[in-house]
Design a protein with these regions (language model features):
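Conserved hydrolase catalytic core segment
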Residues: 98-139
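Conserved alpha/beta-hydrolase catalytic His-Asp/Glu region
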Residues: 157-203
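A catalytic-pocket lid/entrance helix-loop region that shapes and gates access to the active site
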Residues: 134-159
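Conserved HGGG/HGGXW glycine-rich cap/lid loop of the alpha/beta-hydrolase fold
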Residues: 25-74
Length: 203
């Protein structure tokens, strides 16, 4: 495979902590260095966009994972989304990797990566990459995020309405013209309305 080619990714289910099954996009060379990508809270594995395919094209073995309760991964039947359950999930996925992985985590995924690395035997994790993670959590910032995610219990009438809500929440960022990424973080229910694609107890 040459750099710049577009490797195919397959979707895989992982049996994780407490009987919950996680879903990830998997691809690349199993003989190469292993990398697990973990998204932020309220997002999905698709948040990594083209990075997943780009890393696979460069010879890495990639797993872009939906955390429990997010995306296509199962919701915890006991609503257990605590850090111990997340670490248990990561240990289950790491056991399925062909080599000790590099954990790359953004925001909440970074905290899961960090605590997993700290709670694991040294040989289980090769390296740690943190994106948008701080040493301390700002209570006001956390409350703002939770408030935004809970603000629309009735969902959105359209993807465009969801995009308007995100743009109002993040006025310093330009509203994207391509809403494909946002679409992957939403699911349309039988009512026709769009909802965040995550377990209701997460926020």
């Amino acid at each position: 495979m040459t750099i710049g080619s577009a490797p195919s990714l397959s979707t895989r289910r992982f049996a994780a902590f407490g009987g919950v099954h996680l879903v990830g996009d998997v691809g690349g060379d199993a003989r190469g260095a292993s990398v697990i990508l973990l998204h932020g809270g309220g997002q999905t594995r698709h948040s990594w966009g083209a990075a997943t395919s780009a890393l696979a094209a460069r010879g890495y073995y990639i797993v872009a994972l939906d955390l429990r309760g997010h995306g296509d991964s199962e919701w915890a039947p006991d609503a257990n989304y605590g850090i111990d359950a997340q670490i248990g999930d990561m240990h289950a996925v790491i056991r399925e990797m062909p080599s000790p992985p590099v954990l790359v985590g953004a925001s909440m995924g970074g905290l899961v990566s960090l605590t997993t690395t700290g709670e694991s035997a040294p040989h289980l994790v090769r390296a740690l990459v943190l994106v948008d993670v701080t040493p301390r959590v700002d209570p006001a910032g956390r409350a703002r995020i939770i408030g935004f995610m809970r603000d629309r219990p009735g969902g959105f009438a359209s993807i465009e309405e969801a995009a308007d809500a995100v743009a109002a929440y993040l006025p310093h960022r330009p509203r994207p013209k391509d809403l494909t990424g946002l679409r992957r973080n939403l699911r349309q229910r039988a009512s026709g309305r769009w909802y965040w694609h995550l377990g209701p107890e997460i926020f």
